[in-house]
């Protein structure tokens, strides 16, 4: 029987299990929905799936480098309490090592790959869920390759609450690359330079600034000059090379990098849980919740 995307979607909604697990369950049971649910329960995946409705918005980021390849990843847990757990941190390192070795192109591909212990990545995560007692998800990752004349910079803030990976060309100085990564963690730029900012975003900002100036009662003949001046501030907020360097605000990041014979090729900045809903538990409740699981 052909397994359709709709069948996989239905099984995911019923069990909360991952896409690859649902597809395999349906394949093994010839598309029988109830048997597929039982198959997931038998494999211990349903136990993990019961936790799928919880919000996993804590966790940690990690950057690992192996020669000319680097990976940055984010793994989520439900509580900060578990994110500091040694077993959780070991899991994150194991996932990073696997990603570096096998270089999957997508999250779905990664979760379906077989690890050195014979389990798929998703099964390995499920085993950690059963052991630790919280929903855990590999949320995202990015693999970056460098040339011989390039250098990686890695920086983790607050034990991995924020992770940054930079790639610089023309400099073998890792300290420069790390300094830039630290700056990115602090100031959160969106782009390397202004030529990367989409024209649509510039036009939208320009129109907002124009209306602001008109609403302030400024004469139309000076509004355009005001808009251009304020656009420079907009670029400083979102473009790495336009920003004042955090370790020496007297120079721009562009000047700092160029003075060290380098250029910034790209960067990736992950912050745990960004863009996700978070539960509003206080720390006392978090401790109590953890104690109830023991």
From Swiss-Prot:
<dbReference type="GO" id="GO:0005737">
    <property type="term" value="C:cytoplasm"/>
</dbReference>
<protein>
    <recommendedName>
        <fullName>Elongation factor Ts</fullName>
    </recommendedName>
</protein>
<keyword id="KW-0963">Cytoplasm</keyword>
<comment type="function">
    <text>Associates with the EF-Tu.GDP complex and induces the exchange of GDP to GTP. It remains bound to the aminoacyl-tRNA.EF-Tu.GTP complex up to the GTP hydrolysis stage on the ribosome.</text>
</comment>
<dbReference type="GO" id="GO:0003746">
    <property type="term" value="F:translation elongation factor activity"/>
</dbReference>
<feature type="region of interest" description="Involved in Mg(2+) ion dislocation from EF-Tu">
    <location>
        <begin position="79"/>
        <end position="82"/>
    </location>
</feature>
<dbReference type="InterPro" id="IPR018101">
    <property type="entry name" value="Transl_elong_Ts_CS"/>
</dbReference>
<keyword id="KW-0251">Elongation factor</keyword>
<dbReference type="Pfam" id="PF00889">
    <property type="entry name" value="EF_TS"/>
</dbReference>
<keyword id="KW-0648">Protein biosynthesis</keyword>
<dbReference type="Pfam" id="PF25025">
    <property type="entry name" value="EF-Ts_N"/>
</dbReference>
<dbReference type="InterPro" id="IPR014039">
    <property type="entry name" value="Transl_elong_EFTs/EF1B_dimer"/>
</dbReference>
<comment type="similarity">
    <text>Belongs to the EF-Ts family.</text>
</comment>
<dbReference type="InterPro" id="IPR001816">
    <property type="entry name" value="Transl_elong_EFTs/EF1B"/>
</dbReference>
<dbReference type="InterPro" id="IPR036402">
    <property type="entry name" value="EF-Ts_dimer_sf"/>
</dbReference>
<dbReference type="InterPro" id="IPR009060">
    <property type="entry name" value="UBA-like_sf"/>
</dbReference>
